[in-house]
């Protein structure tokens, strides 16, 4: 569902989006998606009219409008070492690019719906785009407080987009929003209990932020319910298995490889990853026909083995590298095939 731009985007005034020497310029490679927009425009809202209208009113109310104060200072509250400063700034850059990519996707979906005469759906996704733009704007302000200016509008000027079927987009979007919700809320709870670890006021906005992510996931869930064929039979089970597994695997490798950021906040990355996965898997019972069975603990235990095998593969060389890769692939495929549980997720049709 993603693609990276090969050319660094230009900034206003003919410059380029360039990061300070201590940050990796590859962080400024947004990923963009495209899908079956004509098919999406045929979404049958009649089978979900009551729920759609309730969700529409909730998004229209924009409960977090006043919570994101544009005049609030985002200057860091504490001095950081050069190493910790780079860790914090790298997090900001990755996050702003991710949020802006989400804005562009939701905006494109909104425009396509409106062009197809589906004004309600178009406005619905405009609300989602609004929230993503607000998040990106706050992250951009936090970067400016660090002396880094990322020109967001020009990030999308020259971009390639990878095509995926509508079902893939909806499954992955739901998980992206819900796993984001659990990430933000768990960090927020930890920092509330450990205020001495709050190094920047940006983290004070994580509570309303996670509320937006949660609502977005509910919006995508509603869209999935309007396409009952996506969640039925073998297809529904396979899509549930693949996307839960791939998102959880990516989260494990990403969180543990970037453990220095969580260390900055006083969070154990392995335990954080485990809790996020447990909660996201449980939340997915509301949308997916199947979720992983964590009762025997095998899925979660294999994370440690997979992480060790991944690092061993990354660090190996010569003839040892393909052997290490083979072990890593074997482990992740075994994890993929672990037992699942059928859910009682609400479906229309």
UniProtKB/Swiss-Prot annotation:
Q: What does this protein do?
A: Catalyzes the formation of the isocyclic ring in chlorophyll biosynthesis. Mediates the cyclase reaction, which results in the formation of divinylprotochlorophyllide (Pchlide) characteristic of all chlorophylls from magnesium-protoporphyrin IX 13-monomethyl ester (MgPMME).
GO MF annotations in UniProt: iron ion binding; magnesium-protoporphyrin IX monomethyl ester (oxidative) cyclase activity
EC class of the enzyme, as a word: oxidoreductase
Q: Which organism is it from?
A: Prochlorococcus marinus (strain MIT 9313)
Q: Where are the transmembrane segments?
A: none
Q: Which reaction does it catalyse?
A: Mg-protoporphyrin IX 13-monomethyl ester + 3 NADPH + 3 O2 + 2 H(+) = 3,8-divinyl protochlorophyllide a + 3 NADP(+) + 5 H2O
Stretches for region Disordered: 1-23
Q: Where is the composition biased (Low complexity)?
A: 1-10
Describe the family membership recorded for this protein in Swiss-Prot or TrEMBL: Belongs to the AcsF family.
User: Which SUPFAM superfamilies does the record match to this protein?
Assistant: Ferritin-like
Pathway the protein acts in = Porphyrin-containing compound metabolism; chlorophyll biosynthesis (light-independent)
Which InterPro entries has this protein been placed in?
AcsF, Ferritin-like_SF, Rr_diiron-bd_dom
| Domain of life of the native organism | Bacteria
Q: What are the GO BP annotations of this UniProt entry? A: light-independent chlorophyll biosynthetic process; photosynthesis
- What are the alphabetically sorted keywords of the record? Chlorophyll biosynthesis, Iron, Metal-binding, NADP, Oxidoreductase, Photosynthesis
Cofactors named for this entry: Fe cation
UniProt protein name = Magnesium-protoporphyrin IX monomethyl ester [oxidative] cyclase
């Amino acid at each position: 569902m993603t693609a990276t731009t090969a050319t660094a985007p230009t900034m206003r005034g003919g410059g380029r989006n360039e990061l300070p020497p201590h940050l990796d310029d590859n962080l400024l490679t947004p990923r963009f998606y495209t899908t079956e927009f004509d098919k999406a425009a045929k979404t049958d809202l009649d089978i979900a009219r009551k729920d759609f209208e309730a969700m529409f009113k909730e998004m229209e109310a924009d409960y977090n409008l006043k919570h994101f104060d544009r005049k609030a200072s985002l200057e860091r509250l504490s001095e950081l070492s050069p190493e910790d400063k780079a860790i914090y700034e790298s997090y900001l850059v990755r996050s702003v690019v991710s949020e802006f990519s989400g804005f562009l996707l939701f905006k494109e979906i909104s425009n396509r719906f409106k062009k197809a005469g589906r004004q309600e759906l178009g406005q619905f996704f405009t609300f989602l785009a609004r929230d993503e733009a607000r998040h990106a704007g706050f992250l951009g302000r936090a970067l400016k407080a660090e002396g880094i200016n990322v020109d967001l509008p020009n990030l999308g000027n020259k971009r390639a987009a990878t095509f995926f079927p509508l079902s893939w987009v909806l499954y992955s979007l739901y998980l992206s929003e819900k796993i984001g919700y659990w990430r933000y809320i768990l960090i927020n709870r930890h920092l509330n209990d450990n205020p001495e670890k709050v190094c920047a006021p940006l983290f004070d906005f994580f509570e309303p932020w996670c509320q937006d992510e949660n609502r977005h996931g509910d919006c995508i869930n509603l869209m999935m319910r309007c396409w009952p064929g996506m969640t039925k039979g073998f297809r529904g089970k396979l899509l549930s298995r693949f996307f839960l597994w791939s998102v959880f695997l990516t989260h494990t490798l990403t969180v543990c490889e970037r453990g220095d950021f969580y260390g900055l906040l006083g969070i154990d990355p392995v335990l954080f990853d485990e809790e996020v996965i447990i909660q996201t898997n449980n939340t997915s019972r509301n949308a997916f026909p199947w979720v992983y069975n964590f009762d025997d603990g095998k899925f979660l235990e294999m994370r440690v083995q997979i992480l060790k095998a991944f690092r061993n593969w990354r660090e190996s060389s010569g003839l040892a590298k393909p052997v290490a890769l083979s072990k890593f692939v074997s482990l992740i495929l075994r994890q993929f095939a672990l037992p699942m549980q059928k859910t009682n997720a609400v479906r229309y049709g």
